[in-house]
Amino acid sequence: MFKKILVANDGSDGAKKALKIAINLAKQYNAELYSISVEEGVPHYAATIGEIEEFRKEADEFFVKINREAVEEAKKEGIELHTKVQAGHEVETIVHYAKEGNFDLLVIGFMGHSKIFGRVWGSTSQNITKLSPCTVVVVK
């Protein structure tokens, strides 16, 4: 049923739960497993080149760490996890990569927000679900 699975990994608790589900599904369906981590860019408050460089260094270290942990977790279950870090807007980048990679399934974690926040900003998981070219599993 699923031959190629993509999991979104931002290092959050929701993403960790999504990774566990994605690993189990990859085992069950003997599917290839990929992860995408999105670096959303330099904060607007970064005023100097030094601050920008420090932010990028910290982001690089963070993504190396979470992806190393994800690869190790998958390996324990006998699954090879291919990781990618991409700069961009979270929703657009994940949806584009899902289309580009011809994935059968996208697994994402859910982060709860207040009703007001959801109305004003929309929900990342909701927007990904609307725009995704493939089946989406949202893990709570």
Where does each model-flagged region fall?
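Small/aliphatic-rich secondary-structure junction motif
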Residues: K3-I49, E73-K75
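Short secondary-structure boundary segments
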Residues: V38, G109-M111, K140
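Conserved beta-strand positions in the Rossmann-like core of class I SAM-dependent methyltransferases
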Residues: Y34, H82, V137
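A short acidic, glycine-rich active-site loop
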Residues: I52-K65
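Short, hinge-like loop/turn segments at secondary-structure boundaries
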Residues: G50-E54, E100-N102, T124-Q126
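Structural beta-alpha unit
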Residues: E72-L106
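Glycine-rich, Arg-bearing micro-motifs that act as flexible, cationic patches
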Residues: L105-K130
